[in-house]
A protein has these predicted regions:
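Conserved N-terminal beta-strand and adjoining loop/helix that marks the start
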Residues: 1-19, 40, 90-93
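A generic structural micro-feature
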Residues: 2-4, 80-88, 107-110
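Short loop segments at secondary-structure junctions
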Residues: 15-17, 24, 95-100, 118-120
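Conserved Nudix-box catalytic region and its N-terminal flanking loop in Nudix hydrolases
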Residues: 17-58
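A short coil-to-beta-strand element that immediately follows conserved catalytic motifs
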Residues: 59-68
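Active-site-adjacent beta-strand/loop module that shapes the phosphate/pyrophosphate-binding cleft
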Residues: 72-102, 134
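NUDIX/MutT-family hydrolases
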Residues: 103-135
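Charged phosphate-binding loop/patch that engages nucleotide di/tri-phosphates or the phosphate backbone
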Residues: 129-150
Length: 150
């Protein structure tokens, strides 16, 4: 079994829409928050800024921590893809410096990015799925731990 991986994600919201990565797999289009794994010697803020520059082509400013989740792959439907993965994700509010442009190092399944209406998230294939409910909630104080969810 591998070690636990720490990942940061950016929650960028503007005018009722959230900025997400647009990805594609055999099941079709799906969405995820921009972000990725922290490397040794890198602060969480540095990691978030690097990942957004790579995946969105823009700089961001880190805001407060909003959500934490565990993802233990063998507990979920994608276990066959990566059966030994355990990741802890820290999801921070983030604010765009310039507008997103073209990603310099998109993820392998990433097609680009999209602004999704938060109200329409229940009809989208977004991961983790709990974001459908969490982002539309009026409650924005404190940090919410989602647990081991997909």
């Amino acid at each position: 079994m591998r070690e636990v991986r720490l990942s940061v994600k950016a929650i960028i919201i503007r005018e009722g829409r959230v900025l997400v990565l647009r990805c594609r797999d055999q099941g079709g289009v799906w969405y995820a928050l921009p972000g990725g794994g922290q490397v040794a010697g890198e602060t969480l803020d540095q990691c978030l800024r690097r990942e957004c520059l790579e995946e969105l082509g823009c700089r961001v400013r880190m805001g407060p921590l909003r959500f934490v989740r565990d993802y233990i792959s063998w507990h979920h439907e994608f276990a066959a893809h990566d059966p030994n993965s355990h990741q802890v994700e820290l999801m921070f509010e983030a604010y765009l410096e310039p507008e997103p442009s073209f990603p310099s190092q998109p993820d392998s399944m990433q097609e680009g990015f999209a602004w999704l209406d938060i109200a329409s998230l229940p009809g989208c294939r977004i991961y983790p799925r709990v974001l459908e409910r969490a982002l539309s909630s009026a409650e924005s104080n404190g940090v919410t731990y989602f647990g081991d969810v997909n």
